[in-house]
Amino acid sequence: MRVHIGTDHAGFELKEKVVAHLREAGHDVVDHGANTYDALDDYPPFCIEAAQAVVDEPGSLGIVIGGSGNGEQMAANCVEGVRAALVWSDATARLAREHNDANVVAVGARQHREEEALALIDAFLETPFSGDERHQRRIDLMKDYERSVRA
């Protein structure tokens, strides 16, 4: 699977480990930065670029990482067509995909040990959208609103 990833300085070290982990698992990972550690960098450009790539490449998924994951999720959700979910447990990671068809996952590097973060990302990537009518209806309502305010 093609996976787009973006982070700032707070998630840089974890991102490097996530990229290696995913490539070892056979995923095609596109790293949208940060490419070097810079304590003064800003997360929006990296996260927006990764999120836009997910929209531009249907079937791909995205990962954004920061200190808490909150701002990174918000930045990714600025991109039309993105449904980014901040996850903190196996259940939230799986439900983001199963019920909400989330296409970007946000993880807080300062909130989880490396093993926990990798498990959250794996759970997100391996869980398909259920396709249940009620979940699709809710997603369609969000898409309709998104289109109406951007028109």
Describe each model-derived feature in a short phrase.
Residues K15, C47, E72, A117-L118, ...:
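A general structural signal for well-ordered alpha-helical segments in protein cores
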Residues F46-V87:
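Helix-adjacent hinge/juxtasegments
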Residues I5-E24:
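Glycine-rich phosphate/diphosphate-binding loop of Rossmann-like nucleotide-binding domains
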Residues R2-G6, A10-G11, D90-A151:
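C-terminal binding/interaction regions
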Residues D28-A39:
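A short beta-strand-loop structural module common to alpha/beta enzyme folds
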Residues A20-V29, G81:
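Short helix-loop-beta junction
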Residues D42:
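N-terminal entry motif of extracellular EGF-like repeats
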